[in-house]
């Protein structure tokens, strides 16, 4: 098997649904053969590792540990979903106090155990804030820490697909701006539908203005809708991390360098 790198990737929060999905995605996409799974909840972590072993990925060195020093030592890449998850009735901002404390400790652990890490991706919400906290406490360069608000633009694309009844490949350059939360802004200005600007379609019989306003609300509340239906968000984040790092069209993993917001 040919991998993108042989350097160590550590997945923090690997016993959770998002973390375990990220681990499987990393293996499927052949990011690296050297993957370490970390979670403080050892029984569930072992269960995730066993499931991945049973997938029989060839040529991989998959390890797991509940010791943060062991997990981070030698890691060149880290992806963390190791914060508390949002539950029904909560906003991402409701998670701030607890997850800010987790992010601060995570940053301190990076500084202590893997100061030579090349890149860190922070997934847990509110991602723009927790990522900044990790950056400050880890002592890394802004370009070395990214946060992931990677679903909103695809949610916009998906809502347009459902509304217009056309393939996703015919809807490009979808963008959302601001925080990955209820206050995000959904714009039509960059989006093209079958080669035509979305702004020329809105407020026409094809998409009345009220329908566009309703569609924006569905995009903004997309995560809440899934939580209401399922109780949690599981699968999208892992694939989005991969897509972002590979430069997927319409998505951005944003370095915390002061220029980019959640896109």
Mark where each language-model region is.
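Conserved S-adenosyl-L-methionine
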Residues: 28-34, 139-142
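N-terminal Rossmann-fold NAD(P) dinucleotide-binding loop
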Residues: 19-20
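Rossmann-like NAD(P)(H) cofactor-binding subdomain of soluble oxidoreductases
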Residues: 91-159
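Conserved N-terminal Rossmann-fold NAD(P) cofactor-binding segment
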Residues: 6, 31-75, 84, 90
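Generic hydrophobic/aromatic pocket-lining and core-packing "Φ" positions
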Residues: 23-24, 107
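C-terminal substrate-binding/catalytic lobe of Rossmann-fold NAD(P)-dependent dehydrogenases
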Residues: 138-143, 153-263
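Conserved glycine-rich cofactor-binding loop
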Residues: 15
């Amino acid at each position: 098997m040919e991998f993108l790198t042989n350097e160590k990737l550590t997945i923090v929060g690997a016993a959770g649904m998002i973390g375990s999905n990220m681990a499987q995605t990393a293996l499927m996409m052949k990011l690296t053969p050297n993957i370490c799974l970390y979670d403080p909840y050892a029984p569930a972590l072992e269960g995730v590792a066993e499931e991945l072993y049973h997938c029989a990925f060839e040529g991989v060195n998959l390890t797991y540990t509940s010791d943060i020093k062991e997990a981070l030592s030698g890691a060149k890449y880290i992806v963390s979903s190791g914060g508390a998850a949002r539950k029904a009735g909560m906003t991402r901002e409701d998670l701030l106090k607890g997850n800010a404390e987790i992010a601060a400790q995570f940053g301190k652990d990076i500084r202590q155990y893997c100061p030579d890490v090349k890149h860190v991706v922070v997934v847990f919400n509110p991602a723009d804030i927790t990522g900044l906290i990790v950056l400050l406490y880890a002592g890394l360069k802004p370009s070395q820490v990214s946060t992931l608000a990677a679903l909103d633009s695809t949610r916009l694309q998906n809502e347009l697909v459902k509304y217009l009844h056309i393939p996703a490949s015919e809807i490009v350059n979808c963008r959302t701006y601001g925080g990955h939360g209820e206050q995000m802004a959904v714009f039509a200005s960059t989006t093209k539908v079958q080669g035509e600007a979305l702004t020329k379609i809105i407020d026409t019989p094809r998409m009345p203005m009220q329908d566009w306003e309703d569609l924006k609300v569905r995009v903004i509340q997309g995560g809440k809708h899934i939580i209401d239906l399922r109780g949690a968000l599981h699968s999208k984040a892992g694939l989005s991390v991969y897509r972002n790092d590979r430069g997927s069209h319409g998505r951005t993993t944003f370095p915390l360098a002061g220029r980019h917001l959640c896109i």
